[in-house]
Amino acid sequence: MLMPKRTKHRKMFRGRMKGAAHKGNFVAFGDYGLQALEPSWITNRQIESCRVAINRTFKREGKTYIRIFPDKPITARPAGVRMGKGKGNVEGWVSVVRPGRILFEVSGVTEEKAAAALRKAAMKLPIRCKVVKREEKENGGEN
């Protein structure tokens, strides 16, 4: 499972997901990518499930790039505990994903195989996603 080795603070505010992704919204490493269309928290278990689904489709060919990392701790109180008495213990880790963010990238496989693998990965996520292709930029921008 993905999680930070160490953090500056143990617990974090929930925050809010406003607007679209400002960074990480272009295919940078691979040839095809999976782009988020909705805002959500993606857990480390969901990321791992997508990684396994993609790699099983490829059968040891091609390369997978994970473009998100779960760096936000999520706390929860035990069941049957009354309100108050402080913030709960860290239960898991999530990555905050905004619309437009590239979640996974793949390279070294055909377009059909890449699209099939990324669609399988999208089924494991709680948000709508679309498969995007790398586009070359003339102006020297990102990729």
From Swiss-Prot:
**A Pfam short name:** Ribosomal_L16
Q: Which GO terms describe its biological process?
A: translation
Q: PROSITE patterns, alphabetically?
A: RIBOSOMAL_L16_2
For this UniProt entry, the molecular function terms from Gene Ontology, in alphabetical order, are: rRNA binding; structural constituent of ribosome; tRNA binding
Question: Which keywords label this protein?
Answer: Ribonucleoprotein, Ribosomal protein, RNA-binding, rRNA-binding, tRNA-binding
The family database entries (SUPFAM superfamilies) matched by this protein are listed as: Ribosomal protein L16p/L10e
Record-linked InterPro entries: Ribosomal_uL16, Ribosomal_uL16_bact-type, Ribosomal_uL16_CS, Ribosomal_uL16_dom, Ribosomal_uL16_sf
Question: Under the cellular component aspect of Gene Ontology, which terms does the record hold?
Answer: cytosolic large ribosomal subunit
Q: Subunit comment for this entry?
A: Part of the 50S ribosomal subunit.
Q: What does this protein do?
A: Binds 23S rRNA and is also seen to make contacts with the A and possibly P site tRNAs.
Q: Which family does it belong to?
A: Belongs to the universal ribosomal protein uL16 family.
Protein name per its UniProtKB record:
Large ribosomal subunit protein uL16
Native organism: Fusobacterium nucleatum subsp. nucleatum (strain ATCC 25586 / DSM 15643 / BCRC 10681 / CIP 101130 / JCM 8532 / KCTC 2640 / LMG 13131 / VPI 4355)
